[in-house]
């Protein structure tokens, strides 16, 4: 920031001009010793210079004042004793000055942000951005600016905004917006805002009500977002914002559960009085002062949006200073108390246990479970104490040390944390869960059946958390006790008979009332008499069995459990926050050893050595994906076929890898016949075998035919002379028919005679057929030289128009290259390369499904009477009345009657707490749009990452050029009409429609959002008759269809999609699908063209391929020599589709040569090269590549390739010519003999 170091000597006035002198100059290099006189002269010169500078120097700044000596203490006279002075006030710590970035943000915000006033207070803010004023729609009030308040605003309810044009005098002084939002930190009124994963977040507690409308700025003071609200997500708050995309279109991003941040006060109700929820009236304003009234106030506002504010105000007692974590969260559970409930297994059978297990949740990873019991932890009867737990010891509350608590499955569990009714533990796998404690010599425990298992993360089934590996998203129960928006339902406890309140006084039954309490009594002697008393009361009954006394406990809540009876009459409900809620986090997962990879010709061999069961998935990147999915448990070796289209495999938690096959092979297509056969046999084994068999068959047929013709001709010649004795054969026939001389009987004798008497003639006789064969071969070669060529050539890609149109393959990374030719101008090089392509369908969210939770309210037990069900609009609500029940409570009878009692049992479905982090979304998918990001180069202009729509209609402005691409030649999409999104995976799944879900299958629980009230459930829920002597609500239902679908969901679309598609979310899209072709049209501006007279003219072009490896990434090297009219730059391009050139242009001298690289799929390429306006043909032979498989796709097209090399064609012509020569020779001999015989006869 400061380029110069601080001076450590008094400043001097510089001599104009004076260069800066470094106080710490670099060391000088060694110099020879100077004479003493020269050194003295130099020192004198420096001293004079210093004196001159010092005379011009200004006065140095004053230094610190000198320390004064303390005077000797003088003896003071004895002063009279004064009162003790109060301690001095504590000096307040000075607030730290904000940083430069924050100061700039605050200044810009204060100048261009205006408060919105409502009833004399700030309700939100409006900001002026880009010539318009933006005001949140949910913020009521008037802008505190006369000019802006007079503007007529337009409403955009979809974005929760109002906007209008600012006056002309204010347009020059407005904030500018930007769509650039790289991940990092931004500024707003309260400090830094973090932007990551397309979300703006701030630490929890930073920002809140009244901050709606504030802008978020980048370091250059540009607005990147406008805040509308927020949602608490654990330790951070996700902001609901309005942003702009790259096209300047407004985009609203609202996290789940976000609330608008206007400062409008939410009102609560108490009886007929309304009051601000954060300021309850003084009568029930504090739980410690008025517990019953406070609970009633909370129950009446159960459904209020500001219930949390009211609960917080009631617990903190309005202005009382509290400790941060302990008092804020633990004190909520001081409104509740433990209870005794039924437990099916207490170690010795069924019992009423003080630590009965209500619920167990084990949907998190890494073996964590959350246990809900009837005991309470971290609380005592007199307040909060983390070292204690409390439970009901009969009718009294008792507290013991928490160290006596334990939990176990197949082995002891590790207690991680505890709070209220809940325990967070990490347990080993097991089929049962036991929770207990020891109170002196008495042991209390409760065991229920619940399967606990370790749930690994990712694609490897490890059994213990690893020390290191890869971080993957997972679900955990947060260790914090902070409220997370999840509640546990509470209510005031029902009446339970307490026989200790009854005693005999003389001959009458006396009811003893504890101090400050009320007791409800019910007596039958013989008339029924009931009532409520706050003091001791003596009845007219003479037997204790004739009365029941119930202690009314309306100062504490208990959990709304199905194991407790409900109070009589209309009972209101309350709620407290659930601790240890499931949240999305990061877990360390194992990373399987890398596979040992072996590359072969068109084959990939993987040697796998898993340490635990590991998933291996593969797919081909062509039109037929051929996906495979298998769990590997033992070391094994697997083989896969790899083609030029590509192959992808994913091993365990490693990222997917893609490989492509090259046209490698043994042998040499330009070598000897056996090398050619080996080469083609490795590439095309079946075709090579068929070709060789065909050649052998042709040779055999040719030889047999030739021999038969010659034999037939000879017989025709010799037969007439055999019939005439002593006939003399003409010389011509003797030569043609090889007539045996009289001195030899057969061929062997003739050859023996010639060998012994005239070897020269013997060799001449042998060479005659060979010479004839060679002559025939030459004749056939001349006939076949004009046959079909073995190379196919693509059409030229040049264009002779200002507007250039072409078709390019839809393959990412493969550039399209061409020379755009325009009359009178030099050719302009054009290159278009796809960076990414996106198929974005129109997705309509049908519903969200997740795991359900069965809610069992406390049953209504009517003693000696009947009750009935009432209709309720709850999901899958079931209600049934059972008669003839005889419940017991803690060992005593609950009712007088034996068979006239009734119980109304209720049960319904609600979302489980895990739904916030573990849910599936069902979408209906329709035809969407195709977008692409392209890199374009024309001439000397390059444009990177241009966004275009691939629809053939929407042009994109690329500098001064206009580009229109699309539509795709194939209207294809990897998505079916119905898809399911689960986490980061997408599945094609035919889910049921909304409202038609079946029990035990996908969609048994449906809702539009995670917080909406349109919850639908079908779980085959059936109520069962309660057992005698037990207060409970038994039921049966189908297992969760969502959990069943998760086990049977199969492979995600990302593992089975053809054409190498990568499936992504937000929004739902398929990226980089190599399907079809893309037509394109580009209008190139005149400025990109150069007059042909200004470019060099090239002549005498000669091209020589120096090195070539076909089917390899630019494995060809060629050199072109030239002569140019002048030096300059020339574009180079191959108009043939056989080769792809790496270079775009070259720099030419007057004469010389340049080298370029090319890629081709032909083994004998012959392609044209255009340099400026001149064209030369390059030819050469290419060798096969050495690498069988590579990790990059081919840069050339394989549509036009040579199947057979020129050398192979030459050998094939020789073979065909040789075999044909035998037939031709026989035909010639037959014709000559037939002609001679015909002439002889006539």
From Swiss-Prot:
Does DNA repair show up as a keyword for this record? no
PTM notes: Structural polyprotein: Specific enzymatic cleavages in vivo yield mature proteins. Capsid protein is auto-cleaved during polyprotein translation, unmasking a signal peptide at the N-terminus of the precursor of E3/E2. The remaining polyprotein is then targeted to the host endoplasmic reticulum, where host signal peptidase cleaves it into pE2, 6K and E1 proteins. pE2 is further processed to mature E3 and E2 by host furin in trans-Golgi vesicle.
- PROSITE patterns from the UniProt entry: ALPHAVIRUS_CP
Membrane side Cytoplasmic: residue ranges: 710-744, 1240-1242
Q: Quick one: where's region Host transcription inhibition?
A: 37-70
Q: Which UniProt keywords apply?
A: Capsid protein, Cleavage on pair of basic residues, Disulfide bond, Eukaryotic host gene expression shutoff by virus, Eukaryotic host transcription shutoff by virus, Fusion of virus membrane with host endosomal membrane, Fusion of virus membrane with host membrane, Glycoprotein, Host cell membrane, Host cytoplasm, Host gene expression shutoff by virus, Host membrane, Host nucleus, Host-virus interaction, Hydrolase, Lipoprotein, Membrane, Palmitate, Phosphoprotein, Protease, RNA-binding, Serine protease, T=4 icosahedral capsid protein, Transmembrane, Transmembrane helix, Viral attachment to host cell, Viral penetration into host cytoplasm, Virion, Virus entry into host cell
Enzyme Commission (EC) number? 3.4.21.90
Provide GO CC annotations from the record: host cell cytoplasm; host cell nucleus; host cell plasma membrane; membrane; T=4 icosahedral viral capsid; virion membrane
**Which residues lie within the region annotated E1 fusion peptide loop?**
885-902
Q: Where is composition skewed (Basic residues) in this entry?
A: 66-104
> For site (Involved in dimerization of the capsid protein), what residue positions does UniProt give?
186, 219
Annotated Peptidase S3 domain residues: 112-261
Region annotated Disordered sits at 1-104
Q: Where is this region: Functions as an uncleaved signal peptide for the precursor of protein E3/E2?
A: 262-273
- Lipid-modified residues, S-palmitoyl cysteine kind: 717, 737-738
Coordinates of motif Supraphysiological nuclear export signal in the sequence? 44-51
Q: Where is this region: Transient transmembrane before p62-6K protein processing?
A: 717-737
Q: Where is this region: Binding to the viral RNA?
A: 83-113
The sequence motif named Nuclear localization signal is recorded at 67-70
Instruction: Give additional notes from the record.
Output: Structural polyprotein: Translated from a subgenomic RNA synthesized during togavirus replication.
Name it.
Structural polyprotein
Source organism per entry reads: Eastern equine encephalitis virus (strain PE-3.0815) (EEEV)
From which lineage does this chain's organism come? Answer: Viruses, Riboviria, Orthornavirae, Kitrinoviricota, Alsuviricetes
